[in-house]
């Protein structure tokens, strides 16, 4: 969070974090010059064959950027309507037939057939929903 604040203060308008392989929260931060900066700390994995349930849940970020040019020539960029659309990497037994679904297109039946259930039988449709709701602020979360 310290690095995100520094990046905002240095002029970033949007910050998208990566690497931890799991979903992490998103928030607005206020830059030193008063701008609102959107930060998504991690979108998780979009496509992977990881073996742990939380590493199979990710998100796609959508947002609108609005650019304004002031009379003095300075340009400002504002972020509008950021949403994290939850994704699920699905694979069959033996990590075969790997594919990614938006959660809104995923079904409880697919979740029951997920290959990760061999090692983690608690993985399922409700688990995915609850995990996303745990990590992502409802202001930004898009499940439907």
What is the predicted function of each stretch?
Residues 56-144:
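A short C-terminal boundary segment appended to hydrolase-like catalytic domains
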């Amino acid at each position: 969070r310290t690095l995100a604040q520094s990046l905002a203060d240095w002029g970033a308008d949007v910050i998208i974090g990566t690497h931890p392989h799991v979903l992490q929260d998103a928030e607005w931060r206020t830059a030193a010059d008063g701008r609102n900066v959107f930060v998504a700390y991690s979108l998780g994995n979009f496509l992977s064959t990881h073996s742990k349930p939380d590493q199979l849940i990710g998100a796609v970020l959508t947002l609108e950027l609005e650019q304004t040019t002031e009379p003095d020539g300075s340009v400002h960029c504002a972020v509008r309507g950021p949403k994290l659309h939850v994704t699920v990497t699905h694979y069959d037994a033996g990590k075969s037939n790997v594919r990614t679904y938006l959660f809104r297109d995923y079904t409880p039946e697919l979740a029951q057939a997920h290959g990760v259930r061999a090692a983690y039988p608690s993985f399922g449709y409700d688990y995915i929903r609850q995990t996303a709701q745990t990590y992502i602020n409802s202001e930004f979360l898009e499940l439907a």
